[in-house]
From Swiss-Prot:
Taxonomy of the source species: Bacteria, Bacillati, Bacillota, Bacilli, Lactobacillales
Keyword NADP among UniProt keywords: yes
Family listed: Belongs to the gamma-glutamyl phosphate reductase family.
Enzyme class, first EC level, given as a word: oxidoreductase
Disulfide bonds: none
Name by which UniProt lists this protein: Gamma-glutamyl phosphate reductase
One Pfam family here: Aldedh
Length: 416
């Protein structure tokens, strides 16, 4: 069983050792790591094959296997993400504001590291590298606890990172992997208030809920993606068809894939047959439709209440027909996970109302929800997509992994 106390102590000590690292040293190391990832591709693929074989033996679906799978191209993309983080401006030490107060005190507010970040995540091994690169660039140590399905991949990736750190003369304890997959150890990490400054969970609804219930350390919640697309009465239906197909079928296992379709009744009778025919030529989808939408499909099943709350991560989509923009907004706000939402419309005023009133971290007009991603938003590799409103919201890049500190300089000042 993992000794969480010892692991936490090492992480805390490492956070103090890497706190003074300069931007130049950090960037040089990240460039070295990016190259090492590509150079070690075959070793990483061999480790990933063990995870894939185990997953296949346990009957994991093809879509979930896709979340777990590493390929040469995906490793190359990981390396590019690391290099992009190296190329980004360093937020640490950035002066947010500076002024002299009425007493003559010189006051600066600067960005500083959080300290030790803990990350609990599922399936995707690339999270290990993405999370480490962002944490390291912001002078934070990180503790990683991945799912048991990706254990071999995560061990290989973290081993590579630690070896690269050691070769560069930097403490390898800047990254630690919790290899014990037990829930008991995960709960220990959630409650490690002496060592962990913030915990970021990244996974399905069950994981997020467990963290919310069990954690004693501060948490930045990265929610599930119950993502909707609303096709308005003034929508370009050809555009809507293209966007829905992309958002649902391109990669259904990711959190920015669309799960719910909301359609204005004025266009439902034209749009549903048009969409169904077009999507069947790409990838058939199981439609779970409400009473108004159901008769408009050639093939669909009646939706149950829970279908409108579900992140399917599969070729399944709920469908709701509404009579107004107001009803669409109300419906989405009732069922959203506050991740990403989209409207297809040619009416600028309708679009602005939707963007203002829908409660989500990212709200799109005439674009696929698949763009909600730190890399796409220019943040470099993301550590997660926050669906809460405090501290950080949306794709979390470098600034989300910093806090602030006030630096006050005086000359013998005392307060009378």
């Amino acid at each position: 069983m993992t000794d969480m106390r010892r692991l936490g102590q090492r992480a805390k000590q490492a956070s103090l050792l890497i706190a003074p690292l300069s931007t130049q040293i950090k960037n040089r190391f990240l460039s070295t790591l990016a190259k090492a990832l590509v150079d070690d591709t075959q070793t990483l693929l061999a480790a990933n094959q063990k995870d894939l074989a185990n997953a296949k033996e346990h009957g994991i679906s093809d879509i979930m296997m896709d979340r777990l799978r590493l390929t040469s191209e995906r490793i190359k993309a990981m390396a590019q993400g690391v290099q992009q983080v190296a190329d980004l401006a360093d937020p640490i030490g950035q002066v947010i504001k500076g002024y002299t107060n009425l007493d003559g005190l010189k006051i600066l507010q600067k960005r500083v590291p959080l300290g030790v970040i803990a990350m609990i995540f599922e399936s995707r091994p690339n999270v290990s590298v993405d999370a480490f690169s962002l944490a390291f660039k912001t002078n934070n140590a990180i503790i990683l606890r991945g799912g048991k399905d990706a254990l071999h991949s995560n061990k290989a990736l973290v081993k590579l990172i630690r070896q690269s750190l050691e070769k560069s003369g930097i403490t390898p304890d800047a990254v630690q992997l919790v290899e014990d997959p037990s829930h008991a150890v995960a709960e220990e990490l959630m409650q490690a208030t002496d060592y962990v400054d913030v915990l970021i969970p990244r996974g399905g609804a069950k994981l997020i809920q467990t963290v919310k219930e069990k954690a004693k350390v501060p948490v930045i919640e990265t929610g599930v993606g119950n993502v909707h697309i609303y096709v308005d009465a003034q929508a370009d239906l050809d555009m809507a068809t293209k966007i829905v197909i992309n958002a649902k079928t391109k990669r259904p296992s990711v959190c920015n894939a669309a799960e719910g379709l909301v359609i204005h009744e004025a266009v439902a009778a034209r749009f549903i047959p048009m969409l169904e025919k077009a999507i069947n030529q790409v990838q058939p989808v199981e439609w779970r439709a409400d009473d108004k939408a159901l008769p408009l499909f050639e093939q669909a099943v009646p939706a149950k209440a829970e279908d409108f709350e579900t992140e399917f991560l599969d070729y399944i989509m709920s469908v709701k027909v509404v009579s107004s923009l107001e009803e669409a907004i109300f419906w989405i706000n009732q069922h959203t996970s506050h991740h990403s939402e989209a409207i297809i419309t040619r009416d600028i005023k309708v679009a602005e109302t939707f963007q203002d009133l829908v409660d989500a971290a990212a709200v799109y007009v005439n674009a696929s929800t698949r763009f909600t991603d730190g890399f796409v938003f220019g943040l470099g590799a993301e550590i997660g997509i926050s669906t809460q409103k405090m501290h950080a919201r949306g794709p979390m890049g470098l600034e989300a992994l910093t806090s602030t500190k006030f630096y006050i300089n005086g000359d013998g000042h005392i307060r009378e």
